Every structure is written in structure tokens, then in C-alpha cells.
Amino acid sequence: MHPNYLLSVDKHTISVFGSTGFIGSHFVSFSKNPVVAMKRDEIQSLTKRIIYFIGTNHNYNVLENYLLDVQVNLVHFLEVLNASRTLHKELEITLVSSWFVYGDGEIPYKESQHCNPKGFYSITKYTAEMLLQSYCKTFGLNYRIIRLGNVFGPGDKSISSKKNALQFLIRRIQRNESIDLYEGGDIIRDFIHVTDVVHGLDLILNKSELNQIYNLGSGVPTNMGKLLKEYAKETNSGSLINSKATPEFHTVVQVKNAYLDTEKIRSLGFEISLPISSQTLKDLL
């Protein structure tokens, strides 16, 4: 770090951890806030304001590396908090979390309701939220927690059947390949374009109260199977869409239906500009 950097940086500048990931890279490129992209091996924030995107992204790691979710979502996060606190007496930490923390519960999910996460990913994300709240109370720091819906959009390099399954299936439809949908795709999700995520994050960072939790999604329940079938029809795809039983492990770690109550963020003036549709999915080509 340049010795004069801390003296010259704008007090509003945000240090972005996870700046090369799907959402983090979009935030660095398109946020209206001044930002500094932290390198992968850096754990000490260059500024008093932090936004933290680093994390695992699905519930399947337990089958191959049972410690990964703990190491990434908890240990590394705490290392960043502690290293940054030694440099800055005041910190404002924004943790980007996930709707997965809600787990089994009434929908639409509200920020105030009890969380009951199911899989290792979900549990460690919720634990990170609680650790952040406790850490900030212990050391007199400030936080925000943002629970995202299912994010879609261009630039996601880690698409798979486990993570961002919607775009994984869209790609197969584009190639006229068959797709398998659990229970015919009769599941509900809350999809939000990454462009709207960046806009929502900016609003929260600049207009919201500190020490609060915000849902960031469309607030619209979307039937995934219906959406995919409409897309296949409108694009004249030759894909066969098959229905299959949901694997037991999937039912253990995920809920069937989920979407977010977005009243709180809408009170800041947030509106969706790119709702999910066949057209916004075509734009991913």
C-alpha cells in the first residue's frame, strides 16, 4: 500500500472485497460510488467503507470439501474484519448475503422474520451475518447486511447446474439441448438483473440507515419452469424439457419456493429497470 494513500483517498471511497466475481466486478465497473478494488490476497481495507462480496455460492461443497464454506464465508471474512479494524478506528462494513439464509419460512421473506437456513452454504452465510453484528457491537463499528435474490445477467463465469441454474439451462436451450427440471420446474424464485443489483446497492450505501438488513430482489415470484418453457417457445428452440423427481439432497439443502419482500428498499426509491422476461434472457446471448 502506498504510504500516502490513506491521506489522499476520498472519505466516501469503498474498498471492494470480491471485486473480480460476477456481482463484485459489475459493482466496481458501474457503481456511482468511488471504489477501490481489493486484490485477492489482501485482507486489510484501504478505506473506512467496505463492501464484501466474497463467498461460496451453492450448497454442494459439503459433498467434496466440507470445510470450504466455513473457511471462505466465515474465517476469511473475520480475517478481513480484524485486519481492517487495526488500521481504521471507524469502519462501515456492508456484507452482501443471500436469500438462502431464510430457509424454511413464510414467503415473501421479510427482513424481520426468523431465519432457518438449511445447507452448509446457507448456514455459514447466516452465521457470517450474526458474527458481523456481534463484531460491530463489540468494537463500536457499523454494518449493513444485504440479502440478494437470484441474480442473473451477463458476465457470470461460474454458471453451472449448481450455481445460477437459470442461465445454465438457458444456455442449453440456446444450443437445442434437452433440459431436466425438478418437478417440471414448478418452483418459485425471485430474479434480479445484476444492473439492478448495482443500483440497489448504491441506494443502500448512500441513503439507508446504518446497522440494518435489506432485501434486494425484484419482489416478484417467478415460476422457473413457466419462464423456461416460454423462452424455448419464443426462440424456436428444439430443446426437450423433461420433468424429474427432486433428489433427496436437494430437498435437504434448499426450499422449493422463495421470493423477497422488497418494501424496505423500495422506500429508498428503488425500482426494477430490467425485469426478468424472455427478452432480458435473449439479451444474455
What are these regions (language model features)?
Residues 3-31:
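N-terminal Rossmann NAD(P)H-binding glycine-rich loop of SDR-like oxidoreductase domains
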Residues 17, 53-54, 93-99, 103, ...:
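SDR active-site strand-loop-helix element
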Residues 41-72:
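NAD(P)H-binding glycine-rich loop region in Rossmannoid oxidoreductase-like domains
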Residues 60-68, 104-108, 157-158:
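Conserved catalytic-core motifs of eukaryotic protein kinase domains, centered on the activation segment
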Residues 78-120:
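Conserved Rossmann-fold NAD(P)-dependent oxidoreductase catalytic core, especially the SDR/UDP-sugar
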Residues 124-127:
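Active-site helix of classical SDR
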Residues 133-188, 194-199, 203, 230-232:
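NAD(P)-dependent short-chain dehydrogenase/reductase
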Residues 175-177, 181-285:
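C-terminal substrate-binding subdomain of Rossmann-fold SDR/epimerase-dehydratase oxidoreductases
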